[in-house]
Swiss-Prot record:
This is Small ribosomal subunit protein uS14. One of its GO terms (biological process) is translation. Coiled coil: none annotated. One of its GO terms (cellular component) is cytoplasm. The gene is rpsZ. It comes from Pseudothermotoga lettingae (strain ATCC BAA-301 / DSM 14385 / NBRC 107922 / TMO). Binds 1 zinc ion per subunit. Its cofactor is Zn(2+). The keyword Zinc applies.
Length: 61
């Protein structure tokens, strides 16, 4: 979970609209974020394996 100060910084209005980027809603990681879920790949995998994401199934072939 990101620190309180970091969360407050995210909420502030941005100087430049172009510089906005996605962050994981759970841990705050800026890279490898799935827009549809708002989660990074690490949190997505963890939550999917725990069954917390409905409709997500592990693929095997």
């Amino acid at each position: 979970m990101p620190r309180k100060g970091i969360i407050e910084r995210w909420k502030r209005p941005k100087k430049f609209k172009v510089r906005e980027y996605t962050r994981c809603s759970v841990c705050g990681r800026p890279k490898a974020v799935y827009r549809e879920f708002g989660l990074c790949r690490v949190c997505f995998r963890k939550m999917a394996l725990e069954g917390k994401l409905p409709g997500v199934k592990k693929a095997s072939w």
